[in-house]
Amino acid sequence: MSSKPFTPEEARRIVQVLQKPAVFLNMTTDWPALHWTVEHLSACLTKRIRFRVGKRSEDMAPLFETECSYVEATIKEFLSWTANDGEPLVGPFLDYHCKEFWAYADYKYIAQLFQDKPAMFQDVVWSDFGFPGRDGRDSTLWIGTQCANTPCHLDSYGCNLVFQIQGRKRWHLFPPDDTACLYPTRVPYEESSVFSHVNVIRPDLKKFPAYGRARLYTVTLQPGQVLFVPRHWWHYVESVDPVTVSVNSWIEMDMDDEARVAEALTKTIVCAVKSSPSLDNSDQWLNPTEDGVSSHDENMQYLNLAVKVCMNKKRDDIEDQPKAEAVKRDFSGVLKSPASPPSLVSFGPHLIPVHLTEKPQCSSTKDSCCFSCTDSPQCQITTKDQDKLRSDNKLGQRSGQSVLQDTENPGGSGEMHISTNDVLECLVHPDVIALVTRLIMCRQRELHS
C-alpha cells in the first residue's frame, strides 16, 4: 500500500473539524476506482441507465430536473454519442445533438448498478478517510458531458466526500449562513434537497437582489482529488471537460436525526398543499427522482417515527453524560467533553482550502461552459431598484414562474396575485421549518418527560 499524507484517523478528524470546503490531494493514488473512466465503465456495465438531458442555454432561470428530458441508454451508447462529430445521429440520443445538449447520469447508486459485480465495491476505499467498511456500496456514480450540471441546492443530511475520476468539475459553493441570499425553494420537491431559485452562473439580480451579497467559494476539482463539502453548504456543480466521472459518499451525522424530522415535516406540508386541486396548482412539482406522492397518513406516520427516533437518541445521549456536564457536540454531531481543546487543521500541499471568490466574474474561458453576467450593465441593480423590490415583496414562486409578479386578474385589472406556490414557499422555508421542528420537539418532550 502506498504512503498517504494522512492516516485514516487524521483524515477523519479533519472531516469532523473542518467547517469550510477543502480538497484532499494524494489520498487516492492506489484506489482501483481511479481506472473507472467512462471507457472502462462501458465494458463493466452493459445495461441501460437513465441520463438527464438538458439544452446548453444562456437563460437566467435555473434548469430544474422537472424541465429536463430523459434518455435510457448504455454507457457505450453514451460514448458513441459524445464522439459524434457531424455524423447522422442514431440510437437513444437521436433527438439530441451533443453540441447543443448535455447529458448526465447522476445519483446512480453503485450498489444497484454493480449488484452482479460486488468485487467492484472494494475499488472505492473510503476507509482511507477513517470510515471503515465504507466503500462503493455507500456511494453514488456521476457520468456527464461538458455543461452537465446539478441545480444549486443544499443537502439536508450529512457532509459529502467527492472523488473526481475523469475530467474536471467546477464547484460553486456558498455557506449555510447565506441561505437567505439564495432564495430557497422546495418546488420541485425532492426529499433531502433544498433548491435555489437563482441561476448562480447567470444570476438575475433584478429578481434576486440579495444574491449579490452571497459569498461564493469556487474550485475546479481535478482527477484523483477528493472534495470535502461540509454540512448544509449550498453547491452548484458543472462538468468542465467533454466527459466527466466522479463518485461521492454522504457521511451521516448525529444531527441528521433532527434533520429527518424537518424533512418529514416538509414532505407532509408539500404533499398536502400540492395534492389539493386548484387552478394554479397543476405544475410539475415532484422531482423525477421521487417514486411518487405518498398519502397524508403515510407522511404523518413517517413524521411520528422520525420524532420518536430523534427523541430516543437525544434521551440516550443525555443519560450517557455525567449530570454535572452540559451536552456538547463537535461539528460532526459527535458528543465531546466540555473540556476538550479546539482542534486546528493545518493546510498544506495535501490539503487545500477552497477559497472565497470576491464576486462572480464574467468568464468566457475554456474552464467554464457558461458565463456570469453580473458585471454587465443590464445586470446591475441600484439602491432605488432594491428598495422597490423590497416594497413589492417579490418572493416565492408562481406556477410556471420563478418569482411573484404583477399579473392580470380574471377581471382584467392589473393587481398582485399570490399563488399556491407563494404560500407554500413561506410555509416550507428552511427558517420556518427549523422553528416548527423545534416547537414539535419541545412539545413532545413536555408531554413525555
Swiss-Prot record:
Q: Which GO terms describe its cellular component?
A: cytoplasm
Read off the InterPro entries from this record: Cupin_8 (IPR041667), JmjC_dom (IPR003347)
This protein's record includes keyword Cytoplasm: yes
Name the residue ranges with Basic and acidic residues bias: 385-395
Protein location: Cytoplasm
- The JmjC domain covers which part of the protein? 102-266
UniProt-listed SMART domains:
JmjC
Query: Could you state a single Gene Ontology molecular function term?
Result: 2-oxoglutarate-dependent dioxygenase activity
Bias kind Polar residues: ranges: 396-410
Q: Please describe what this protein does.
A: May play a role in cellular stress response.
Its protein name is HSPB1-associated protein 1 homolog
Q: What is the lineage of its organism?
A: Eukaryota, Metazoa, Chordata, Craniata, Vertebrata
